């Protein structure tokens, strides 16, 4: 490993530890179980899963560090000049599915890639972001989530949050449904527009912001009463989450195509989901308002 890779790895391992500790404290019941694994083709990771807690129904915070002789198609499709290069990929990825339908599902990811070829300069880039998927929308939560995202981006330029917010809205979109997965946040990839130290500082700012963005929302909503019908709606909307992850998500596709660990890759899927044929929310209901108002490409900080 290069000194750069070592620095990124040390940060990611520490980030995983800190996020797991914060989530365990907030849940107040369940604890993460660690499953360390080795990838036969090169590398390995620490999968940490939590479930059946007081707040968290299922969640995972995964660290992986894998390498190989050639980039898989999902990583080189939009940069064909990198095809055939050896690669190293490090990242922390997490998904939290709460019991309570009033607590949104959250996802975050920070990652680092190096693609190398003998006789040529190494190409590196960062990617990541975080996004929120509510089932029963709340403006206060949406504004808070995006405010934390904006504050994390602010030291790196006034244009950074708007660009990566818009990218998130485009990326987490279910084309076959014609709707976004959630209310967005930040998404970016192929980040090397600044020098390495600045890009690495940005990644740290995003990774460190996740807990500040998510836990206040959990604290506000975790004790909200809910009905069996609201729970059913949560499970129905979780189906959209599954559809996106299995059809569009680049991280899922990269992991499967690179021979990654299937259990860790599919950790992001919720434990209970339902699909109903041509199901429609009642007009004027909270369920209808989710798609009509909250699941829109909205400027939450400018309204």
UniProtKB/Swiss-Prot annotation:
Record SUPFAM superfamilies: Coproporphyrinogen III oxidase (SSF102886)
Cited PANTHER family: COPROPORPHYRINOGEN III OXIDASE, MITOCHONDRIAL, OXYGEN-DEPENDENT COPROPORPHYRINOGEN-III OXIDASE, MITOCHONDRIAL
Cofactors (names): a divalent metal cation
Organism, scientific name: Pseudomonas putida (strain GB-1)
Enzyme kind, highest EC tier: oxidoreductase
Region (Important for dimerization) residue spans: 241-276
Gene Ontology BP, a term: protoporphyrinogen IX biosynthetic process
Active site, per annotation: 107
InterPro entries associated with the record: Coprogen_oxidase_aer, Coprogen_oxidase_aer_sf, Coprogen_oxidase_CS
Gene Ontology cellular component annotations, sorted alphabetically: cytoplasm
Protein name: Oxygen-dependent coproporphyrinogen-III oxidase
Signal peptide: none
Oligomer and partners: Homodimer.
Keywords: Cytoplasm, Heme biosynthesis, Metal-binding, Oxidoreductase, Porphyrin biosynthesis
Subcellular location: Cytoplasm
Annotated function: Involved in the heme biosynthesis. Catalyzes the aerobic oxidative decarboxylation of propionate groups of rings A and B of coproporphyrinogen-III to yield the vinyl groups in protoporphyrinogen-IX.
Record's catalysed reaction(s): coproporphyrinogen III + O2 + 2 H(+) = protoporphyrinogen IX + 2 CO2 + 2 H2O
Annotated substrate binding sites: 93, 109-111, 259-261
Binding site for a divalent metal cation: 97, 107, 146, 176
Site residues by UniProt (Important for dimerization): 176
EC number(s) reported in the record: 1.3.3.3
GO molecular-function term, one example from the UniProt record: protein homodimerization activity
Pathway note: Porphyrin-containing compound metabolism; protoporphyrin-IX biosynthesis; protoporphyrinogen-IX from coproporphyrinogen-III (O2 route): step 1/1
Gene: hemF
Family: Belongs to the aerobic coproporphyrinogen-III oxidase family.
């Amino acid at each position: 490993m290069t000194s750069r890779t070592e620095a990124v790895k040390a940060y990611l391992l520490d980030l995983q530890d800190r996020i797991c500790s914060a989530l365990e404290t907030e849940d107040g019941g369940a604890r993460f179980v660690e499953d360390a694994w080795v990838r036969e083709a090169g590398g390995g990771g620490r999968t940490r899963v939590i479930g059946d807690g007081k707040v968290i129904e299922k969640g995972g915070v995964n660290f992986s560090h894998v390498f190989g002789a050639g980039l898989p198609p999902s990583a080189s499709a939009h940069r064909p000049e990198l095809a055939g290069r050896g690669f190293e990929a490090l990242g922390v990825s997490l998904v939290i599915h709460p019991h309570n339908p009033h607590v949104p599902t959250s996802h975050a990811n920070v990652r680092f890639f190096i693609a190398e070829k003998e006789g040529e300069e190494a190409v590196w880039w960062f990617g990541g972001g975080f996004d929120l998927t509510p089932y029963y929308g709340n403006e206060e939560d949406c504004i808070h989530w995006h405010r934390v995202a904006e504050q994390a981006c602010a030291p790196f330029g006034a244009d950074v949050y708007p660009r990566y917010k818009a990218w998130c809205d485009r990326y987490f979109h279910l084309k076959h449904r014609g709707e976004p997965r959630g209310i967005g946040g930040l998404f970016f990839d192929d980040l090397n527009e600044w020098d390495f130290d600045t890009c690495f500082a940005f990644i740290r700012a995003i990774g460190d912001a996740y807990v500040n963005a998510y836990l206040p929302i959990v604290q506000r909503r975790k004790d909200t009463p809910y009905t069996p019908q609201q729970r059913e709606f949560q499970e129905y909307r979780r189906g959209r989450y599954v559809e996106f992850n299995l059809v569009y998500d680049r991280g899922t596709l990269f992991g499967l195509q690179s021979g990654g660990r299937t259990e860790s890759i599919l950790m992001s899927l919720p434990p209970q989901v339902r699909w109903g044929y041509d199901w429609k929310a009642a007009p004027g209901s909270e369920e209808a308002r989710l798609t009509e108002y909250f699941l829109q490409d909205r400027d939450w900080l400018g309204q």
